[in-house]
């Protein structure tokens, strides 16, 4: 069994990328439930992510989801994150809500739908 010191060393190196949607309203596949204090825009989501990183030291990166985290100036957005001590990480595109993606997006049986997903 690993000692507490060994476990702590591993945890000190642990880095987690949190998804931006984790800082918004949540719910089930049937309904999203509004909550007070939820971020109103991507900049506020990053501010919440910075608080998580401040308290854990392990969540320095935030994965974005487009179109929900779309902003006009990504350089300004990245600087905002950096100023707060976090970075913008993975970019996830929404290739699942469009009706065309009912049978998948980049693996759809219809070549036109696959191409649409790639263009997205």
Give the location of each predicted region.
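N-terminal pre-domain/capping segments
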Residues: 1-120
């Amino acid at each position: 069994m690993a000692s507490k010191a060994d476990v702590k060393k591993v945890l000190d190196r642990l880095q987690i990328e949190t998804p931006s949607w984790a800082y918004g309203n949540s719910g089930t596949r049937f309904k999203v439930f509004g909550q007070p204090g939820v971020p109103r825009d991507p900049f506020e989501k990053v501010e919440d992510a910075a608080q998580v990183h401040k308290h854990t030291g392990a969540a320095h990166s935030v994965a974005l989801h487009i179109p929900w985290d779309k902003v006009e100036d990504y350089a300004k957005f990245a600087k905002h994150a950096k100023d707060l001590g976090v970075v913008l990480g993975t970019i996830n595109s929404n290739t699942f809500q469009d009706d065309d993606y009912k049978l998948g997006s980049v693996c759809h049986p219809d070549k036109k739908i696959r191409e649409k997903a790639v263009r997205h």
